[in-house]
């Protein structure tokens, strides 16, 4: 399924960007960077919600976004 591959690629790109920010440590992020991290997390949550009832592992989102990026 080409559309599923595209969604997985989008998720990978967002996750990579969010992981890069997370690696700095939340306490070291400035307001702009923290805003970016929030936006990435919200984007991933929106995609998760759209895939409710499906296997999130298929698109690389089988994790708790809030715990990974915000808590």
Task: Label the predicted regions.
Residues 1-34:
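N-terminal acidic leader/helix
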Residues 29-63, 67-68:
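Short, charge-rich amphipathic interface segments used for partner binding and complex assembly
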């Amino acid at each position: 399924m080409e559309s599923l591959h595209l969604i997985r690629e989008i998720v990978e790109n967002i996750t990579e960007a969010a992981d890069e920010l997370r690696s700095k440590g939340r306490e070291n992020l400035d307001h702009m960077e923290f805003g970016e991290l929030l936006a990435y997390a919200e984007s991933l949550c929106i995609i998760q919600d759209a895939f409710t009832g499906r296997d999130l592992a298929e698109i690389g989102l089988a994790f708790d976004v809030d715990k990974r990026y915000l808590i």
